Amino acid sequence: MKTLRILPFLVLLPFLSCSSSEDEPTPTPAETMYFPNNTDNNWETKSIASLGWNQSAVPPLKDFLAEKHSKSFMILVNGRIVMEEYFNGHSATATWPWNSTGKTLVSTTTGIAQQEGLLNINNKVSQYLGNGWTSEPLEKENLITPRHLLTMTSGLNDESNWVIKSNLTYLADAGTRWSYSNVFQKLIDVVAASSNQTFENYFNAKLKNKIGMDGFWNFGTIFTIYHSNTRSMARFGLLFLNKGKWKNEQIINETYLNEAISTSQDINPSYGYLWWLNGKSKYMVPGSQTVYPTALVPNAPADMYAAMGAEDQRIYVIPSKNMVVIRMGDASDPQNPNFALSGFDAALWDKINAVVR
């Protein structure tokens, strides 16, 4: 009798299982992150239509970019090119200066040197450059670490962009004052000294060649600026979107990367390790001690972080959308060029938001 009671239930099981499987929708697999090859120009694309974005808002975006003196513009989603546009005589093979956007290359190379045990960003800078690299009293100079250079809190006088010893005078104790200045360039010397080779050689071997970038450094008397094509800038943005990993190789460890794109001090919470951070309660800008009580770009995604350079060079990384946005070009407002943040950011995001939905 026990067998007779159990059998009908067992017979029903396959049908119940079948019915459940047919009623439930098949989950859509998450799209994998794509990485272009390092050896050719092939790069997968993805259409705006396939993303469900607003195609009719693309022409106004392109018109805006052209009118604002842009040279190039790219959007990547999961590493695939959704938009790639060139303007005002520029081309895919032409190089363009990154300006201060390249500070993030220095930050990243510094992090790689730390993960290789060549330096520690919490040690004294003088441990790598020797005593007397500034004109400060030794007890004040010894307060400065590479971390202070990464966070713009060295306390050194910021009146001159020319980073020579006579200009590096005391203004405040390290860590007590945020001020955007060129003294971050001393990180280039720290990496060179700790790696026992030129910064450029170390950068090429540990970062540039690993992710297939092109380009070169121009070490000028005052400014040190990286130049490359637009896709090389996009490759670097993609590396950060994928948390420092390129294909199967961890180029920069996640611990340092997360520090770099997080608030690094409480004076200007919108600043990491030479990266700008959106979604914070306040921010400061180059050349001013004014504190603005709002997010960096209020109409952009709150989780966005950005590399920002003079004349509106931009890398925007938006993890929540698996998206990287690149803009290279001349200043959007030639009469009022800015070193970093400008009104261009909010205006551009108005146009991007009309496309991305």
Predicted regions mapped to residue ranges:
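Sec-dependent bacterial lipoprotein signal peptides
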Residues: M1-L16
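N-terminal leader/targeting segments and the immediately adjacent pre-domain N-terminus
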Residues: L16-S91, W96, Q114-L119, T151, ...
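Short active-site loop at a secondary-structure junction
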Residues: F64-M74, E85-L129, N142-I144, L171-W178, ...
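Active-site SXXK
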Residues: G79, W96-N122, L149, K186-V191, ...
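Short, well-ordered beta-strand elements
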Residues: M83, K321-D330
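Active-site helix/loop module of the DD-peptidase/beta-lactamase fold
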Residues: E116-S154, S195-N229
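Penicillin-binding protein/beta-lactamase superfamily catalytic region
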Residues: G212-P319, D333-S342
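C-terminal/domain-terminus segments
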Residues: I326-R357
